[in-house]
């Protein structure tokens, strides 16, 4: 029967309700007990009994099945647990399963260290502490079993924007007010100035006829709606019941019609102690002694608590607010539209723009005091100013003498002056404001942003009384000095000067000429010429030393360039292939040359020369055509010839021709009759694009330094020869030689030459930096990609001025028919010397 009824039970009983029914009365494991009841605190009320949907058991069924499987529908407890509870109430208490367990060793004993409970892990020392269970499990209840925290205790980010309204108003009333706010069509618009006095008056005017006012925010206040929420409630005294985006619904409150209670200061402890017994009884002496003592003790306790709260918490705040209010009232009118908290700042725009006779305050730095602020002091002052309310609200950028005068008065009682910038004011610049205030007051600006400007009065600031005393002392000292000077002038005016019978000649030109004629060195008529020759020789020797120093410097730079070039060329390993090259006939060469020059597709070879990308693009061209045309801009035909032989050796093709075209030189290479595409298109023995550019730059640097070194060397040799010539004509002199030296070696020319040399060397450094940035581009070797690799015509003209003669000869050689070069190529193709020549040329 039990087996027969179980399917029906399982079918009709929902799984969720079955899990909620207790199936056993045995005590749970200790760790499970700890999980459900951590430290026996925070225990929740037992859940209500689940609905039993099972059928009524038949009389013939075994009662043990109900006890083992089911529970009582009335209480939700198992039948066995009910029987046991009745037996315990009747006095028949059986053995408790917890008491039947062996007793635990006493706490603190040696055996207690080795005790291990279920669900409790040992600590770092291998033992178990009394609080390990609590620390390990903590609040082990499930999230739905834990009590919900109040809205005010929730994190600020998790709170509802209207949590205060949800706490103070009933849900039905809050729902009604929100529906009423949705039906309101008119909205009060708040601009960039924030919650001003006009906005507050407009809201209160609407509250006379409506309970809820809708507010639409725009401008700067919309950037921080949480702050606007707080300011709106504080200014108007209402309650925000709904907020979404920049729209706010403001409720006037339940007791809006009632007059607002005036703020009264709390009673003193003595008044509380005197008034309380009078309220309790008209005659305290008629009370019993015990009652009077108890009343007196309760009064004393109440008074002490109230006094403590008033003194500890609220007294400093009230004192600060009162003092700052009095101080700001003395400085000027308040800015009533201030959106922040009290106290209201002084409206600096209502202060006088110009004050006649205003001067910056007199300042004197005490002896031994550092004038500037340290970093720590500056940080502390900024942190202090961050929490202070602003003292002034400023909206204009000029005519700030009235504000400066008020700041000086404020500095007598406060070391920091904080200025708030009005929002929504056009044509204002905080930087100009800060500069003008600093000039007028002499203070130190601590911080400046779009909202506040903070000034420190400075270490040399003096109060008005002390400054007046010091100025009086200074005026007194100045008057004494003026009196002494006047008396000294009067005494010198009345003094009689003795007159000499004969005027003296001391210090006159006659005395100097007479002394030179008696004691001076006599020079002959050629003395000036000798001095000029000596000066010229010294100048010439100095020029030689200077050029020798430049020569040594250039030699060091050239050695450095050679080292760098050698380091760059370590990865360059030219091909040394001993295979016999393929040959083509003269007719084939003629046809290939003609077809290659007519090809529209070509490759550009720039300043990088032959590198792995060049060979890769040649193989890519050979995939669809047999010929490849390469355009090269080189300085000489010898360079073009070297490049052509290098391309032939590295690619494995056959060099057809090298021709002079309008864009430079055209190199035509045939892929060969037995061409096979290699597995790796980029050869590993050549440089990469980046390294090829670095090698090109270092080669150009080395060539420029070589020319510079040769030029300096020739100049030094010529100067040394001229020095020898000057020694030969030292006695008789040579005016023509001196005139030639003056014209050739002037100091101005040397200075210009030095500047040219420095600019020449700096230009190469800039090219290196630009080339490094250029390497980040793509490796495509197309015509558009490598046009920038060619050197400019101006740079070529500047770099190759010494080799113009050689270039002319090369151009002349290239202008002749290329038959000689073609014949040389054909001659190379007849034997194995061609490959050796390629290696040597490379």
UniProtKB/Swiss-Prot annotation:
One of its GO terms (cellular component) is chloroplast stroma. It comes from Zea mays (Maize). Residues 167-263, 371-468, 582-682 form the CRM domain. Residues 831-842 have a biased composition (Basic and acidic residues). Residues 49-80, 141-160, 254-290, 768-842 are annotated as: Disordered. SMART domains: CRS1_YhbY. Residues 1-82 form a transit peptide. It comes from the Eukaryota. GO terms for molecular function: mRNA binding. Keywords: Chloroplast, Coiled coil, Mitochondrion, mRNA processing, mRNA splicing, Plastid, Repeat, Ribonucleoprotein, RNA-binding, Transit peptide. PROSITE patterns: CRM. It holds the Pfam family CRS1_YhbY. The keyword Secreted does not apply. Residues 786-812 have a biased composition (Acidic residues). It is found in: Plastid, Chloroplast stroma; Mitochondrion. This is CRM-domain containing factor CFM3, chloroplastic/mitochondrial. Residues 703-732 form a coiled coil. Its main location: plastid.
């Amino acid at each position: 029967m039990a087996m027969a009824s179980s399917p029906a039970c399982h079918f009709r009983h929902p799984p969720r309700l079955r899990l909620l029914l207790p199936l056993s009365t045995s005590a749970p494991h200790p760790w499970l007990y700890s999980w459900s009841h951590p430290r026996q605190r925070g225990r929740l009320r037992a859940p209500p009994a689940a609905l039993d949907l099972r059928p009524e058991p038949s009389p013939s069924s075994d009662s043990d099945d109900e006890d083992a499987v089911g529970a009582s529908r009335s209480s939700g407890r198992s039948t066995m647990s009910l029987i046991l509870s009745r037996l315990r109430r009747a006095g028949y208490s059986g053995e408790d399963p917890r008491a039947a367990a062996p007793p635990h060793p006493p706490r603190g004993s040696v055996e207690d260290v080795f005790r291990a409970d279920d669900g409790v892990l040992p600590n770092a020392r291998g033992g178990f502490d009394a609080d390990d269970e609590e620390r390990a499990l903590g609040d082990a209840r499930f999230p739905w079993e834990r009590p919900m925290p109040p809205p005010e205790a929730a994190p600020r980010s998790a709170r509802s924007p209207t949590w205060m309204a949800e706490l103070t108003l009933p849900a039905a009333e809050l729902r009604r007010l929100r529906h009423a706010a949705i039906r309101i069509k008119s909205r009060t618009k708040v601009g960039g100035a924030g919650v001003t006095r006009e906005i507050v008056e407009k809201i209160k005017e609407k509250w006379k006829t409506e309970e809820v006012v809708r507010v639409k925010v725009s401008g700067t206040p919309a950037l921080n709606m949480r702050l606007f929420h707080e300011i709106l409630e504080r200014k108007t005294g209402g309650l925000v019941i709904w907020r979404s985006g920049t729209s706010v619904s403001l409720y006037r409150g339940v007791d809006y019609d009632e007059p607002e209670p005036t703020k009264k200061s709390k009673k003193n402890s003595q008044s509380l102690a005197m008034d309380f017994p009078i309220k309790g009884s008209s005659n305290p002496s008629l009370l019993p002694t015990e009652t009077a003592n108890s009343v007196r003790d309760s009064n004393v306790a109440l008074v002490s608590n109230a006094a403590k709260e008033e003194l500890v918490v609220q007294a400093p705040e009230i004192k600060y607010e009162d003092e700052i209010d009095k101080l700001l009232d003395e400085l000027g009118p308040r800015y009533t539209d201030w959106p922040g908290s009290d106290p209201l700042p002084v409206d600096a725009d209502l202060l006088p723009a110009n004050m006649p006779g205003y001067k910056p305050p007199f300042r004197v730095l005490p002896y031994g005091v550092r004038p500037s602020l340290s970093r720590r002091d500056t940080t502390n002052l900024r942190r202090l100013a961050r929490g202070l309310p602003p003292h002034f609200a400023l909206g204009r950028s000029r005519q700030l003498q009235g504000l400066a005068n008020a700041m000086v008065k404020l500095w007598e009682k406060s070391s920091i002056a904080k200025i708030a910038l009005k929002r929504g004011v056009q044509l204002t610049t905080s930087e100009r404001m800060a500069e003008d205030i600093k000039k007028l007051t002499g203070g130190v600006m601590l911080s400046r942003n779009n909202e506040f400007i903070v000034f420190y009065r400075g270490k040399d600031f003096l109060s008005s009384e002390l400054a007046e005393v010091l100025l009086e002392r200074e005026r007194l000292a100045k008057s004494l000095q003026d009196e002494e000077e006047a008396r000294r002038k009067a005494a010198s005016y009345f003094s009689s000067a003795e007159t000499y019978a004969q005027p003296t000649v001391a210090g006159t030109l006659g005395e100097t000429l007479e002394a030179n004629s008696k004691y001076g060195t006599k020079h002959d008529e050629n003395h000036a010429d000798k001095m000029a020759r000596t000066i010229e020789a010294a100048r010439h020797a100095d020029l030689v030393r200077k050029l020798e120093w430049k020569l040594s410097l250039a030699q060091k730079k050239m050695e450095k360039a050679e080292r760098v070039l050698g380091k760059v060329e370590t990865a360059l390993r030219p091909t040394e292939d001993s295979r016999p090259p393929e040959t083509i006939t003269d007719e084939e060469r003629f046809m290939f040359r003609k077809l290659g020059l007519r090809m529209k597709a070509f490759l550009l070879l720039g300043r990088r020369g032959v590198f792995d990308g060049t060979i890769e693009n040649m193989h890519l061209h050979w995939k669809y055509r047999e010929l490849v045309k390469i355009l090269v801009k080189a300085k000489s035909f010898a360079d073009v010839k070297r490049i052509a032989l290098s391309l032939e050796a590295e690619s494995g093709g056959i060099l057809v021709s090298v021709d002079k075209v309008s864009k430079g030189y055209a190199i035509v290479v045939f892929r060969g009759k037995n061409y096979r595409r290699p597995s790796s298109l980029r050869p590993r023995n050549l440089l990469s694009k980046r390294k090829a550019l670095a090698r090109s730059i270092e080669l150009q640097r080395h060539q420029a330094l070589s020319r510079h070194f040769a030029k300096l060397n020739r100049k030094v040799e010529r100067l040394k020869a001229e020095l020898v010539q000057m020694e030969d004509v030292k006695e008789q002199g040579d005016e023509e030689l001196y005139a030639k030296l003056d014209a050739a070696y002037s100091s101005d020319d040397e200075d210009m030459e030095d500047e040219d040399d420095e600019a020449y060397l700096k230009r190469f450094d800039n090219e290196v930096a630009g080339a490094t940035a250029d390497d980040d581009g793509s490796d495509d070797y197309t015509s558009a990609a490598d046009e920038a690799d060619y050197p400019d015509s101006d740079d070529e003209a500047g770099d190759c001025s010494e080799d113009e003669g050689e270039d002319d000869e090369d151009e002349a050689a290239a202008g002749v028919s290329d038959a000689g070069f073609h014949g040389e190529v054909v001659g190379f193709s007849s034997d194995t010397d061609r490959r050796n020549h390629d290696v040597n040329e490379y």
